[in-house]
Amino acid sequence: MEEFQVYLELNRSRRHDFLYPLIFREYIYALAHDHGLNKSMIFLENQGYGNKFSSLIVKRLIIRMDQQNHLIISANDXNQNPFFGHNNNLYSQMISAGFAVIVEIPFSLRLVSYSQGEEVAKSHNLQSIHSIFPFLEDKFSHLNYVLDVLIPHPIHLEILVQALRYWVKDASSLHLLRFSLYEYCNLKSFITPKKSISIFNPRLFLFLYNSHVCEYESIFLFLRNQSSHLRSTSSGVFLERIYFYGKIEYLVEVFYNDFQNNLWLFKDPFIHFIRYQGKAILASKDTSLLMNKWKYYFVDLWQYYFYMWSQSGRVRINQLSKYSLDFLGYLSSVRLNPSVVRSQMLENSFIIDNAMKKLDTRIPIISLIGSLSKAKFCNTLGHPISKPTWADSSDSDIIDRFVRICRNLSHYHSGSSKKKSLYRIKYILRLSCVKTLARKHKSTVRAFLKRLGSEFLEEFFTEEEHVFSLIFPKVFFTSRKLYRGRIWYLDIICINALVNHE
């Protein structure tokens, strides 16, 4: 956030009104390029336009934008466009990347002022995404039902632009955003992003999505807090609404008229709400009747107040003791762990059967094998195959790629309660690496391993195993009891590709 303070030369009292001129500043594109370098890729390297950014191209783009009376961009005419010429896709992505940095400035400056001791007016101190892990460990096993919610997309792109009006008061910036959205995507491509979205910056879409979700989440949390004095556990990225608290009085009147008869069913102190990306869960210890009320409340709120098409099938009610919840790349459920205790009292003995609830987190092995199959590491049955596209690289480069993928998978899924599936994935990657090297050297797998020896596979030892061997005593390290438990790493949220296997 210091980078914004260094470069911005805008009046502090009018920063929100003059964001559009920043699109003509070279440092904005440099910041956008730095953001692009921080992405974490799992299976493939970044081969997009981001590695072609240069100061000469940026200057050429700014000069052309400054000389034109109208910003004419056409994604359907990449070769004949008089404005961008043959570099239409590159320039288009540069503009969207720069604009993604610009629209984040008001929110970033608000965080900077808060870190400097200035009070942020009436903002919620909501918990971060990392609060999901203690929630799963401490609270999840005590709950009975969960609502598995797929958050719907807006039915019209204008809704995304309207959501930013609370943030950006610069009409020119909003017009540029509206023009770009209508030019490069329609409703179908926005819901299932394909090639048309590849030239539009994903960071910008993530910002627009979060700002839109905050609209109805703020109302939901307000109603949730009115029905219970306990705060809900929220793990999404929320953006403060400037004028929300000025409308609370109106919202109370609206919900009083429309939901008065149902509010008494919502008074549940054990409700927990968590959102991550396009999914949300609402977990409760109460009955299925309460969860049905919440289900239809969500659907009505989306359809009648935010004009988003939603069906009741997008909100599923699952009983945790019978179904698994697919969330954050894990299949989580609550299973009963039976135990038998013999109690001796004088001459009489009693056998007491006791069942304790225990959190069970499993790896979705089928979807992971499907992802490895798409990346050509194995076939659809999970049998390892060679990676022919990497056979032209050096041996060290091939090994480094496989080791990086194996460590990322092991690092992310270290929170699994059953490690057998993880060992199978690591076996697929190890054998695929050996087959790729054997293919390169025109040898068999058996002969290649015999020549290199068993030390060859030591590269696949995960990073955490080396760390634990240094930190913990040898008695714990050799007993291997440490690895049977769940270990949550706070940096796994950076491995975005593992959350959505499909």
Curated annotation (Swiss-Prot):
This protein's GO CC annotations: chloroplast
InterPro entries assigned to the protein according to its UniProt record, in alphabetical order: Domain_X (IPR024937), Maturase_MatK (IPR002866), Maturase_MatK_N (IPR024942)
Name of a matching Pfam family: Intron_maturas2
Keyword Ribosomal protein: no
One MF term in the entry's GO annotations: RNA binding
One GO BP: mRNA processing
Entry keyword set: Chloroplast, mRNA processing, Plastid, RNA-binding, tRNA processing
Cellular compartments annotated: Plastid, Chloroplast
Domain of life: Eukaryota
Main location as per UniProt: plastid
Function: Usually encoded in the trnK tRNA gene intron. Probably assists in splicing its own and other chloroplast group II introns.
Similarity comment text for this entry: Belongs to the intron maturase 2 family. MatK subfamily.
Name of the protein in its database record: Maturase K
Lineage, broadest ranks: Eukaryota, Viridiplantae, Streptophyta, Embryophyta, Tracheophyta
Encoding gene, per UniProt annotation: matK
